[in-house]
Amino acid sequence: MVWCLGLAVLSLVISQGADGRGKPEVVSVVGRAGESVVLGCDLLPPAGRPPLHVIEWLRFGFLLPIFIQFGLYSPRIDPDYVGRVRLQKGASLQIEGLRVEDQGWYECRVFFLDQHIPEDDFANGSWVHLTVNSPPQFQETPPAVLEVQELEPVTLRCVARGSPLPHVTWKLRGKDLGQGQGQVQVQNGTLRIRRVERGSSGVYTCQASSTEGSATHATQLLVLGPPVIVVPPKNSTVNASQDVSLACHAEAYPANLTYSWFQDNINVFHISRLQPRVRILVDGSLRLLATQPDDAGCYTCVPSNGLLHPPSASAYLTVLYPAQVTAMPPETPLPIGMPGVIRCPVRANPPLLFVSWTKDGKALQLDKFPGWSQGTEGSLIIALGNEDALGEYSCTPYNSLGTAGPSPVTRVLLKAPPAFIERPKEEYFQEVGRELLIPCSAQGDPPPVVSWTKVGRGLQGQAQVDSNSSLILRPLTKEAHGHWECSASNAVARVATSTNVYVLGTSPHVVTNVSVVALPKGANVSWEPGFDGGYLQRFSVWYTPLAKRPDRMHHDWVSLAVPVGAAHLLVPGLQPHTQYQFSVLAQNKLGSGPFSEIVLSAPEGLPTTPAAPGLPPTEIPPPLSPPRGLVAVRTPRGVLLHWDPPELVPKRLDGYVLEGRQGSQGWEVLDPAVAGTETELLVPGLIKDVLYEFRLVAFAGSFVSDPSNTANVSTSGLEVYPSRTQLPGLLPQPVLAGVVGGVCFLGVAVLVSILAGCLLNRRRAARRRRKRLRQDPPLIFSPTGKSAAPSALGSGSPDSVAKLKLQGSPVPSLRQSLLWGDPAGTPSPHPDPPSSRGPLPLEPICRGPDGRFVMGPTVAAPQERSGREQAEPRTPAQRLARSFDCSSSSPSGAPQPLCIEDISPVAPPPAAPPSPLPGPGPLLQYLSLPFFREMNVDGDWPPLEEPSPAAPPDYMDTRRCPTSSFLRSPETPPVSPRESLPGAVVGAGATAEPPYTALADWTLRERLLPGLLPAAPRGSLTSQSSGRGSASFLRPPSTAPSAGGSYLSPAPGDTSSWASGPERWPRREHVVTVSKRRNTSVDENYEWDSEFPGDMELLETLHLGLASSRLRPEAEPELGVKTPEEGCLLNTAHVTGPEARCAALREEFLAFRRRRDATRARLPAYRQPVPHPEQATLL
C-alpha cells in the first residue's frame, strides 16, 4: 500500500510540474547491499556561483527530509542515514553501506533564497528510485530441534526476504518434498504434517534461493512414541541340552528402553523351569541355557519406553529330541461289545515313526487278533472289546533320533459303556411358542455326562437341560428347528443319539446351496429349499446388476416367481458380460423367510464365429441386427411391448414381425406387418390368465434379422382380455391333466360300482337259489371208537356233545323235491305231462308259533276242472301238496306265495289278476315268527319292516299243481311223520271247525302288529356244538299269543304243548301244540335240524295239513300219549353209556336215511347231482 500511495503522489507531482517547464525525468538507480550509490540531482546551475540555496533530499514515506544542507552549515541527516550519506557534485546524494531497507523513492529539492516564487516551489525537484539488490535472508525459521508426540499434527514455517524475492523449498533427508503428498503439505514456505508418525521423524531443510544467492535452515523433527524394533528375533532350531540365543533390538525416542521376553504369553521369569536358565542381555537378546523339550514354543520380545503401546516381535524355538512317552495311565478301560482304543501318549520331534507294543511282556502281533489295528499316533484300535483285550500293555515310540525308552505298563479293564435309559424320538413336531421337552438319560460306570448339542447353528441361552438330562425348549423358537444330538460320555466310551425338531407355525427357513449357472444372456438359478414351517412355501428369485461405482448403494432388484414345487428357475433377458447379484426368497402364509446368500454371476455372450472371407468391405452391405431391448409391460389397456430399433440396418427398415407363444408351444405369428417406425405395440387378441412369450423379427428388403430377446408377461387379472374360451388343446397341461384324470377316475369308479353290483346280485341270486335247492344235508356218523364209561350217561358237558364236520352230499334234499313238485314215491310208468296237469292253487306254507312249518286249509278248487278230477275225490295229501309253493322270505316277514312252475329269483312269474288270498297255513305262520327270523345267522333273512296299512297283498299263483304220488295216503294206517320221531306229540284237529282258524287269527294279528312282537335276541343263538344240526339254534319256548300278539315263555319243565291246559285245536285263540325239538332224538344234545326246515319237519307239516283239512273228525291223542312206535323210540333215549347212545342214534339215522332214499329214488329231480351239497359227519 505504501508503494502504491507513493506512486500516486509521484504521479501527481509530476503532473503538476509539467506546466511551464516541461515534464521532469524519473531516474532509477540500482545498487547492491553493502555498497554505495549516488542519487543524482542537477538542479544547480552548471556554471558560476549559485545563489544562496537550500538542498533537501526527501524519501517517500518519511515525514521529514532525510538530508538538509544550507550553506556552509552542517547538514541535518536522518538517524537511519547518519554516517552513510553526503552530497557529491552539487546536489547529488551519495549513500554508502546500502541496506535492503534503503530501497525506495527519493526526491531532490533545491530552494534559491533570492528567487522565491511560491508557485515554482515544486519546480526545482527531481525523483530518483533506488533499488537495492540483496541475497535471501530468513526472517522466520522453525527451531533447530523439534519434539512432537506421535499421531499429533506439526507445522514448520520458513519466511525469507531479498531482492529479488527469494523462493522457499523444503527437503527431508535430501529429498525435495515439493508441494507435499499424503499427510505432508507444503505451501508458501510452510510445511504442515497432519499426523506425525514414526516415519515422519528426521531432519527437514528449508532453502530460500534467488538470483542474488540462497539461504538454508535445518530442523530436526523428533517423534515421541513407543520403540521401533529394528532387529527382530528369528526362528531357531536346537537339539535338546544345547544353548540358544534370540536377538531383539529396538530404537525409540526417548531411548530409555526396557526389554521383556514371553513364552506363550507368559513372562520367562515367571516360568519355574525357565527362570534359572534364562538371561536377557543389554541389547535385548534372550539367552537360554540347556534347552529341554518343554522349552520349545513361541518366544516374544517386547521393548518399551513407557509411551503408548509397545511393539512386539516373535520367533519360534524348535527343540529336537528322541520320541518319548509322556504319561501312561496305570489302567485303561475298554467298553464291552464296542470299539475301544488303548492310547500311547507320545511326543517326538522329529515326528513319530512307529510304536511297538507288548502285551503281558511279549511283543504284540496284531495279525493274531482280528479287527485290531494301530492308528497313526501309535494307539491300539480294538474293534470289539472282549476278553481277548485283557492284559498288561506297554508301548515304545521311535523317531529319527531314536527313543527315550518304553512306557510304564497299563492294565486293560473291560467295563460296560454308557447306556441310554431313555432315548428321544426320531422326530418332534411342535408349534412355535410352546414348550418342548425331549427326554434323554443314560447310566454307566463311572456315571456318564449327558450333554445336548445342536448340529449347525447353536442356540444362545434358549435351550436348557434339567436335572434328568432332558432338553427343555421353552418357549420353542424358530431357531430351535434342526438336528439335535444327545451324547453320554465317560472314561469308558461315548455314545450318542440324535433327533430332529420341526417347529411348526413359522415362516420358511432360508434356502441353502444357491448356485447360478451362467448362460448366454441368462442364468439358471438352483437351490435347496429349507423347512417350510408347516405350510406350503413358494419361492422367488431376486436379481440386480452389480453397481459399477462403490458409492452407489441403491439397487433396483427384480423378482421372478418360481412355479410351485420347483427348486430352480431360468432367468432370461440378462446383459452379457455384466455381473449380476442373485438371491432366493421363500414365503408361506405366515410371511417371508430370510434372503439367501447373494451369489454373483455374469451371463455369457453369444458365441461368435470368425467371418468367412468375402467381398471387400465397401461391397458388403451391413447385416440387419435384431431389435433390441424388447420389454412387455402390463397396462390397463392390455400388454404393451417396447423395443429399440436394430443397431445395424442395411437400408430403410421396412417393418417387424411379432411372434408369440403360450408356455412350451410353438411360435405363432401374431402381427406380420408392424411398421418399421414403431417402437411400441399394444398386443390385441390375448386370453386372460395365460403366460405369454413374445419376440420380434425385423426385415428390410431381402434381409431378415434374427429374433430379438424374449419378453415374458402374464395376463392374470387383466380384465381387458376375455376369459379362457379356447379349445381344450389350449388348456394348460396341468389343468388338462387334472380334468382328464378326474374324468377317468369317475369312469373307473362307475364301472367298478356297476361290476361290483352285478357281482353282488349274481352271488345273492346264486345264494338264494342254492338255499332253495339245498336242504339239510344228512348226518353220517363215523364208526365209534372206544366205548365211554357208563358214568358218562346223560352228561351235559361240552365233552359229550358230538362234533360235526361239513362234507358234500351226493343226495338231493327233500326240500328240492318239494319245491320242484316232483313225486317222492315210485314214478308212474305213464306220468302226466306238465301241460296236462295244469296249475293248481297252492296253500301257503307258513311257520307256526313254535317255529315249525305248518299248513293252512286247502283252497277251494277252481270251478272248471276236468271230468276225471271232478269225479275223483281228493285226498288230503293231494290237496295239501299245493302248500309247498309258499315261502316266508319276504322282507316283512309275512308269507309270500310262490309259483311251483318257476321259482327262479331272477325271472319272476308273469303278473296275473289278483285272487283272494287264503288264510295263512301253519307252516307260514311258523316261518313268520320273529324269533325264527333272528335264527338266521347268515344274515340273509330280510329285516322286519313296519307294515303299511295300505300295502297290497302279495301275488299268489292260484293255478293248480299236479297231484303227486308222494302225497297220497299210504295203504297202511296213516301215521304222522312227526309221530315217527321220538318225543313228538302232535295234536291233529278232529273237530268240525278247522284248526287253521286259530293260526290264521294269530297270523293276522302278527301281520297287523309286527312291531309289537319282540324278536328273540341274537345272543340266544349260542352254539354248543360244531355241527349244523346241534343246539346251534335256540328253539322257541312254549308261548301263547296274547291280545297284543306277544308270547310268553313257559316254565323250564314244560314240554307238553304250546297251549297250556286242556286247550286243543278247536279253540280259535290257540294254535297247534308242538313239543320241544330237544326231545325228538335219543341224544339230548343233538337234533336232526339245519338252517332250514328238515325233511321230517316238512313231512310232519304235510301230515298236519292233511289232518286239519279232513272233513271227518279224527280223534285227537291226548297230551303225553305216545304210539307204540314213539314209545319204542323214546325208550331208546334212555340208554346207558355214550357208546350205546351213539349206536342207537346211528340206527335211528340209518332208518331215517333209508326212508328218505326210498322216497327220493322215486323223484326224477333228485337224480341230478346238486352243485354244492353238504354233509354233516360226526367226528
UniProtKB/Swiss-Prot annotation:
Family in the record: Belongs to the immunoglobulin superfamily. Turtle family.
Motif (PDZ-binding): 1177-1179
Record topological domains on the Extracellular side: 21-734
Stretches with biased composition (Low complexity): 785-800
Organism of this sequence: Homo sapiens
Protein name, per record: Protein turtle homolog A
Residues with Phosphothreonine modification: 972
Fibronectin type-III domain residues: 507-611, 623-718
Record domain Ig-like: where: 24-124, 136-216, 226-318, 322-410, 418-502
Residues passing through the membrane, by range: 735-755
Stretch forming the signal peptide: 1-20
Localization, UniProt: Cell membrane; Synapse
Modified residues (Phosphoserine): 809
Region (Disordered): 606-626, 767-919, 940-988, 1015-1079
Gene: IGSF9
Its biological purpose: Functions in dendrite outgrowth and synapse maturation.
